[in-house]
Amino acid sequence: MEKKRYYVGMRRFIILSSFIIGFVSFFISYNKKEDASLLDKLEQMMCRTKMNVHCDPFYGYQIHYPAFFEQVPDSLIHETGCCQFYFGNMLKIAQTAFIVTNLDGFTVRQGMEHFAMEQHATERRCGNDYFLLSGPLYINHRPVEGYRFYAKYVQRQKLWFVQSLSYPASCTRAVSRLIEQIDNWQVWE
């Protein structure tokens, strides 16, 4: 009889211990997920999300944007060939594509110097038919505190096809996938 009671007591102890360990493990892992910062969550979302493709109906260029970004309705954009996608959950991230007419007939290098000065770019890189600019974000010649921009200008005849990203400086690592997409952007794929 004493042997049976020993097994029953041991079984209760093992079941109770397993339940407590499972509960504590769940509680710890749940709290760790809550402790992940918004930037870490954004970075994970950017890495895992599907990229949607937008094809401009007038010019035919394509851009890739994260599936969780929202598109600004065409009715709010009055420029032909312009589109914008954004993520506005406390952090304001905007991916924009638009067309600029090259009325002055700038070469790629001249265009880079002109737009770099206009946008207060601190970094620039030039290719055969494109250039990349980045730096602190300015709107109406005033700096936007804590924000940066990254843009690619591609020259096609008398047009500049532009894809630009504006984002909080604290999100630089989180938007690295979008920056890489802009780096590799071909106007017509």
Can you say where each PLM-predicted feature lies in the sequence?
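Hydrophobic membrane-insertion alpha-helices, especially the h-region
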Residues: 13-29
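Ser/Thr/Pro/Gly-rich low-complexity linker/stalk segments immediately outside membranes or between
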Residues: 31-49
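Sequence contexts marking disulfide-bonded cysteines in secreted/extracellular proteins
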Residues: 46-48, 82-83, 125-127, 172
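Acidic/histidine-enriched, beta-strand-rich ligand/metal-binding domains
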Residues: 51, 172-176, 182-184, 188
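Secretory pathway targeting signatures of secreted, lumenal, and periplasmic proteins
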Residues: 52, 57-112, 138-142
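Buried hydrophobic packing residues in well-ordered domains
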Residues: 69, 163, 185-186
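Signature of long, low-cysteine stretches enriched in small and polar/charged residues
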Residues: 108-173, 189
